[in-house]
A protein has these predicted regions:
Chain A
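C-terminal motif of bacterial Sec signal peptides marking the signal peptidase cleavage site
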Residues: 20-23
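Bacterial signal peptide processing site
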Residues: 25-27
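Active-site glycine-centered loops adjacent to acidic/histidine catalytic or metal-binding residues
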Residues: 58, 89-90, 125-126, 185, ...
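A short C-terminal boundary segment appended to hydrolase-like catalytic domains
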Residues: 322-372
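N-terminal active-site segment of His-dependent metallophosphoesterases
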Residues: 32-103
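Extended active-site neighborhood of metal-dependent phosphoesterases/phosphodiesterases
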Residues: 93-227, 241-262, 266-267, 275-278, ...
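Bacterial N-terminal signal peptides that target proteins for export
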Residues: 1-12
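Structured segments of extracytoplasmic/periplasmic soluble domains
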Residues: 56-62, 72-79, 108, 112-115, ...
Length: 372, 173
């Protein structure tokens, strides 16, 4: 996305208000001239560097529900500002896309988010790598089409998946000091429900360690104020799939990746061992902001945003302590981050509409701020 | 003095390697000072340089060992090697097999592959040593960035070629 970085003094000379900058969601630090230009208004205070983004997931159905969430996110971003979005996987149901020209690029991405004019950074989910409706995750080639779409001539340019796993910093302007570093993880090969886990074609035994090594190294080297990992699969969840290591109750009969134990191991050795700030994920089709748990450094906060289209009831709503959680309703999260605060708002749709007050202002169902 | 000098010269090639590490179904000699973990993510062995003394190596160099059962009525070393190549390519892009060498290690047949591929944001080179251990295949893989790999080829190759079968234990999970 080409974003406007116009010095405030220039805007003042042009007679434009500084409010324009915040309305477009710009997050770059702004320098003011030390000597005011004669005849110009008094300098506006230096803007605090700020990043705003939305998180949504499990969305890719190309149906009325997805379109409604897309419209609600566009409405909210217009009112409050968004620099970019993150999508927590299962971007295309039930079995991913088969090329960079698959019709689902239009029906389940470009059209539902046509009014959302910001970059979207997606993670891959089990349905993105699947050959069957259960989303077994046995066809990584389909996920690779999603990587390829990033540079495809047919793309609107919003889709940003340069690799199956990667990192980026925000503000997105390379010149700005990073406030947040995002680590986009590929959880599916470590949590797939494969028909034959012993089949070496799907073997995660090398991919797991190399991804772990990359994540640990990148996390260790991060200079950002806040660190956020996002993936499709949870570490903990009160939704139908449950916690990693016992996904869908498979922990009693552990075979290969089905119970998600390899994915849990990756998180334990990296995010949990090294004190990640936030893990945002999907897989379960609801909204949760879960409290830190002792098994993961008692600091990392877990945010589930998987209500981007069709939704489900909780599996066990008391499995993990939550600050707030909502099932059976479409929704998404909006975040505003500064050097000292990380605020998240859970927006739950009512009758497939963004909830607003009498003045037309968005009404989040839940808000939480974490400070440093 | 002359005797000590001779002894030092004789021991020099060995000094780059630590004692033989014995795992579940395999043994291997790791490069000196490398630290190892067993069983994380179901991987029998993961090893790399220590973070405290070699942060760059910790972030780039990685050795893994896997032990996989084989039905020898159906699978030979050549067939298993093809499956391994397919597995690496499955998770990678820009995948290239640079070399495939047949080896014999203490009477057991093995294949040494040299690979180059992209995984996630990284370009990697790898030695993959596949050893026929009777009813199972052992695989030692060492990966690093191309630059570090070229610089450490001898050390990496010695490590993977030290892979040997050992007795197996019962499955943990």
């Amino acid at each position: 996305m080409n974003r406007l970085y116009t010095p405030i003094s220039t805007l003042a000379v042009l007679g434009l208000s500084a409010g324009l900058l915040t309305a477009c969601g710009d997050s770059a630090p702004i320098s003011l001239p030390t000597t005011p230009v004669p005849g110009t208004p008094a300098p506006t205070p230096i803007a605090t560097p700020k990043v705003r983004f939305i998180a949504f997931g499990d969305a890719g159905r190309g149906n009325e529900n997805q379109n409604a969430v897309g419209a609600a996110m566009a409405q909210l971003c217009k009112l409050k500002g968004c620099d970019f979005g993150i999508e927590t996987g299962d971007n295309f149901y039930e079995v991913g896309v088969t090329s960079v020209t698959d019709t689902q690029w239009q029906t389940a991405f470009e059209l539902p988010y046509k009014d959302l004019n910001i970059p979207i950074y997606p993670a891959l989910g089990n349905h993105d790598n699947a050959d069957t409706d259960v989303g077994e995750g046995a066809n990584n080639a389909k996920g690779n089409f999603q990587v390829d779409y990033t540079t495809s001539p047919g793309s609107s340019g919003k889709w940003k998946m340069p690799a199956r796993y990667h990192a980026f910093t925000a503000p997105l302007s390379a010149a700005a000091t990073p406030l947040i570093e995002f680590f986009v993880l590929d959880s599916s090969p470590l949590a797939a429900t494969l028909p034959n886990p012993a089949e070496t074609e799907y073997n995660y035994l090398t991919y797991g360690p190399t991804q772990l090594q990359w994540f640990q190294t990148a996390l260790m080297a991060s200079k950002a104020k806040w660190t956020v990992a996002f993936s499709h699969h949870p570490y903990i969840s009160n939704g139908e799939h449950g916690n990693a290591g016992n996904f869908d109750g498979a922990g009693m009969f552990p075979v290969g990746t089905t119970d998600g134990q390899p994915w849990k191991d990756l998180m334990d050795e990296s995010a949990c061992a090294m004190g990640l700030d936030f893990h945002i994920f999907g897989h379960d089709h609801d909204l949760e902001w879960l409290k830190p748990v002792a098994s993961c450094n008692a600091k990392t906060e877990f945010i589930l945003s998987g209500a981007g289209s069709d939704v489900r009831a909780f599996g066990d709503a008391t499995l993990n302590p939550a600050y707030f959680q909502q099932d059976l309703a479409q929704g998404f999260f909006w975040f505003e981050v500064t050097a000292t605060s990380f605020t998240g708002e859970m927006h739950v749709l009512k009758d497939l509409k963004l909830q607003v007050d009498a003045a037309g202002q968005p009404m989040p169902m839940f808000t939480r701020t974490v400070t440093k | 003095m002359k005797y000590l000098l001779t002894l030092a010269v004789l021991l020099l090639p060995l000094s780059a390697f630590a004692a033989r590490l014995v795992g579940d179904g395999f043994s291997i000699e790791l490069p000196q000072g490398w630290e190892s973990r067993q069983g994380v993510m179901d991987v029998p062995l993961m090893a790399r340089p220590p973070q405290a003394s070699d942060a760059e190596g910790w972030g780039q160099d990685l050795l893994t060992v896997t032990v996989e059962k084989a039905d020898k009525r159906r699978t030979c070393l050549e067939g298993f090697t093809q499956r391994k190549l397919k597995e690496f390519a499955y998770h990678a892009s820009q995948f290239e097999k640079l070399e495939e060498l047949p080896l014999e290690l203490q009477g057991r047949v093995a294949t040494l592959l040299t690979l180059r591929y992209r995984e996630g944001p990284r370009e990697l080179m790898a030695y993959v040593l596949i050893l026929d251990a009777g009813n199972r295949f052992l695989t030692a893989t060492v990966t690093s960035s191309p630059a570090r790999f070229e610089f450490q080829r001898a050390k990496f190759r010695s490590a993977v070629e030290s892979l040997r079968p050992a007795s197996t234990r019962s499955k943990k999970r």
